[in-house]
Amino acid sequence: MASLPFNTIPNKVPFSVSSKPSSKHHDEQAHSPSSTSYFHRVSSLCKNGEIKEALSLVTEMDFRNLRIGPEIYGEILQGCVYERDLSTGKQIHARILKNGDFYARNEYIETKLVIFYAKCDALEIAEVLFSKLRVRNVFSWAAIIGVKCRIGLCEGALMGFVEMLENEIFPDNFVVPNVCKACGALKWSRFGRGVHGYVVKSGLEDCVFVASSLADMYGKCGVLDDASKVFDEIPDRNAVAWNALMVGYVQNGKNEEAIRLFSDMRKQGVEPTRVTVSTCLSASANMGGVEEGKQSHAIAIVNGMELDNILGTSLLNFYCKVGLIEYAEMVFDRMFEKDVVTWNLIISGYVQQGLVEDAIYMCQLMRLEKLKYDCVTLATLMSAAARTENLKLGKEVQCYCIRHSFESDIVLASTVMDMYAKCGSIVDAKKVFDSTVEKDLILWNTLLAAYAESGLSGEALRLFYGMQLEGVPPNVITWNLIILSLLRNGQVDEAKDMFLQMQSSGIIPNLISWTTMMNGMVQNGCSEEAILFLRKMQESGLRPNAFSITVALSACAHLASLHIGRTIHGYIIRNLQHSSLVSIETSLVDMYAKCGDINKAEKVFGSKLYSELPLSNAMISAYALYGNLKEAIALYRSLEGVGLKPDNITITNVLSACNHAGDINQAIEIFTDIVSKRSMKPCLEHYGLMVDLLASAGETEKALRLIEEMPFKPDARMIQSLVASCNKQRKTELVDYLSRKLLESEPENSGNYVTISNAYAVEGSWDEVVKMREMMKAKGLKKKPGCSWIQITGEEGVHVFVANDKTHTRINEIQMMLALLLYDMGTGSK
């Protein structure tokens, strides 16, 4: 590409009427009283959009044998530009050609024709006319560069900018903004800096539109520091300048900064525009800022902004993303013009809230409005089927896609595959994959995700290597999915090896890569390694997000590592401006409770008392863990008073509290309450807790009756509770029956054999005990030893030791301390 000759100065002579015909005879006729009168009338009509009436006047001039000056044709062409009337403009062009070369080869008319076709996005015709221009001026170049930028031919637009400079035609404040736009679209920051240099040398930096376009360009290129510097140097910032920087912040995920900038803009007294409000709504939606978004809506109302398509769409997007579907409905109902995008947003909003029936109803209304479904509509419906595991709906949508020739759309094909995978039909997902002719990386990754979510690591690996044989190189998403498949299958070491392979292949792990490893470690009981991965992630320069933090806190909870948990809490306070996210607060409450600091858990919860149900659920669970039944019940009873409706997790936690406290009467009251008053259907876990509580209280018959009456098949945990109860009460007649049921339920669980063996030992049935031991040996099962963790103040990491473990490096110290503790306990008991 040619270099930019920046040692130049801009044009000193503006484009003028000197380029019109110079014939004295023609000039006199064109400006005769009659011609002048017609010119003014034509000009007035064109400015009012009355092109046909203007053409009638030109026809009248022809009829009266009046010579038509080039400026009249120029005015009509300009009117066609305003109205985007390509057809009428072509008629004028034909008339010009008919009148001969005197008009057709006139520089003024040639330029006007190029501008007209370019502004109407007729690039081919515009380029042909442009190539025939005898004199190319800044106006014709501006038109060509503008149209190329508009229709996405950004490299061509930049080549035009270079050619202008090489021909010493200096881009002005109309050309430069389009050049900046092209740089931003291509993310060519180095070229953009060159354009910036030209702007400074040509003295255009004081033009607010040029400066704003530079800020916008730097923002799109991700160079926010330079965008901010350009913005700071603008002397008189208008809304366009503020909007440019705000949009840059939002596009680069700096949503908080965008909101702060909006606040500064208002303090400066600059009136916000629709673009301003729409940008703030996007920022609010991205960061879940409900109050910020509502304030933006209020500002739009106060400033009298009409609820047009742009503002209405932004409001819909915001309210749907933050889950305020009722507000989204009100905005939708008040919008006068609704296009397919508008309908898609409200349908998507219903799907996100799990309101599939409402989404389908809106689709029906959309058809009544004579609007056709597009790929987004169908993909949203397919997503609804996937979220609700509604295979029937998914197949109906797929049939619609086939009937209306959408089956070749790769994006839709990937959503169909995802739907089948979520509905548990991976075979059908593979069929869709195989039937798709052109497979892109997204399609390969979709099938890989289906295998990964199901823990089918073997199939995932075959697909992973197969795609590379097909010439499709894996990206970071592909690597993340193959790692996930291994972790879901419990192959921790293989996942770690694959993580290293990803790095050695030149793929840099992203935030999702690290978080996937961390979460997989926690799920597979390797919480200490999860904390190490968090540290390595930070060393690589990545900042943890909310999900990474919740995973790390979960690891601390599993390890009961209060020291590390406090360190992470400190990081949250220092680095996460929106540390009040419910997921983080919930994880903090859970971590502090499981690490032995119930008071700190209460403090975290108390600062946001009753704000969200997940947070309240976590606090009830904490009380249950500590046996604080009174506090758990009080919190449970108070939920509805603050507008929170208990869910299945709430009931599970409060029943667990009753279980820990051994309060069977309170548990029965709550269990009865959810069935009779709340119209909730108890889930299997609720029945399990009640069975466990009844069995622990010696009410074995009642527990058995509850199992027989419940609408679920009993799980192993319930039967274990009954076996333990029978063991305690010496009800030997039930042990044989329950033992068979337990082994049928979970034949590979060593704990079940131990439970049954203990029950037979209490009976004195030693032959059965031996039989259980032999069955375990035949199946290759071993009793898992008890395991404990301890963290020593001032030391890194967590010490792990198991029952009868003599391999620990500090075993002598442990045994000495244990002896001292036993001695103290013995002394205290005397």
UniProtKB/Swiss-Prot annotation:
Keywords (A to Z) from UniProt: Chloroplast, Plastid, Repeat, Transit peptide
Region of interest called Type E motif, as start-end residue ranges on this chain: 718-793
Keyword Repeat assigned: yes
GO biological process terms, semicolon-separated: mRNA modification
GO molecular function: mRNA binding
Location of the protein in the cell: Plastid, Chloroplast
GO annotation, cellular component aspect: chloroplast
Each PPR repeat, start to end: 69-103, 106-136, 137-171, 172-206, 207-237, 238-272, 273-307, 308-338, 339-373, 374-408, 409-439, 440-474, 475-509, 510-544, 545-575, 581-611, 612-646, 647-682, 683-713
Residues covered by region (Type E(+) motif): 796-826
InterPro entries reported in the protein's UniProt record: E_motif, Pentatricopeptide_rpt, PPR_At4g14850-like_plant, TPR-like_helical_dom_sf
Interval spanned by the transit peptide: 1-59
Annotated S-S bridges: none
Sequence segments annotated as region (Disordered): 15-36
Function: Plays a major role in chloroplast RNA editing. Acts as a site-recognition transacting factor involved in the edition of the site 2 of ndhD (ndhD-2), which encodes a subunit of the NDH complex.
Family that this chain belongs to: Belongs to the PPR family. PCMP-E subfamily.
Protein's name in the database: Pentatricopeptide repeat-containing protein At5g55740, chloroplastic
Organism: Arabidopsis thaliana
Lineage: Eukaryota, Viridiplantae, Streptophyta, Embryophyta, Tracheophyta
